[in-house]
Amino acid sequence: MKRSTTLVTAGFLALTALFSMPCFSLEVEVSFSAEVESETIDGRVILMLSTNDADEPRFQVRPGVNAIQIFGVNVEGMGPEEEVRIDGSVFGYPIQTLEDVPAGTYQVQALLHRYETFHRADGHTVTLPMDRGEGQQWNRAPGNLYSTPQKIDFAPDSDAIIRVKLDQIISPIEPPSDTEYVKHVRIQSELLTEFWGRPMFLGAHVLLPHGYKEHPDAHYPLMIFHGHFPSDIGDFRTEPPDPDLECEYSERFHVECYNRVQQEEAHAFYQKWIGPDFPRFLVIEIQHANP
């Protein structure tokens, strides 16, 4: 009996020692000052870690196995100087937890993607990111807060606290200008405004046929392209390709100098468009900025 009691006591002491050992947990705290934004914000805080310093981490985020590390957490009413904590409990990609990220030197950046609350006509109230002219690209959305990238020696097995300050705000996007061949239209939709409970707009980019000004009363066939959110008429370039353009490799298409190919093809299309034997018609690309 004495032996059994001794074993139980020893086991209890061992467990006590185990659980009393220091538990290291790296944390990242994200905040912004009143000088950057004085109001509270609903949205999503995004933390990015990259070993590539050729560009900001927010421009390196992509799907796939070669993705940079990213974490995200939703926030409601985040105010100035309030710290949002990202620790081992926050889900990430491609590595799921902060604790499993390999130690090393990383370029670290955080961004706060703004959400809006919509009181819809169907009775539902939802909080969603509204497009602000960028085509639902959170890393370029005007009004989003982000931090200046900083290099940090990252050690997941430490109890350090990394503080990241959102010290920048993305500027509004200038709408594209009309040209001889491309016009832009923007109207408020009564139906969408009523449904979403706030002003909603539809846009269109119009490619005019060659000779349109000389024949203002002519009727033309119409081709409508309904994609996602085109920023302007694409693949149409009146200027010749830039001879000094620095080549960029396309990972998507596995093509060298793909940016140069795009300019060449866009200018070739323009030359065909104004050619004497090319059909004359209107092209419209629809722009619908929904949440």
For each predicted feature, which ranges?
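Positively charged n-region of N-terminal signal peptides that target proteins for export
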Residues: 1-4
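Non-catalytic cap/lid and distal C-terminal segments of serine-dependent acyl enzymes
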Residues: 35, 51-91, 96-291
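Boundary at the C-terminal end of the N-terminal hydrophobic targeting segment
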Residues: 23-25
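Beta-strand signatures of extracellular beta-sandwich domains
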Residues: 44-48
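A short, amphipathic beta-strand motif
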Residues: 28-34
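Bacterial N-terminal signal peptides
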Residues: 9-20
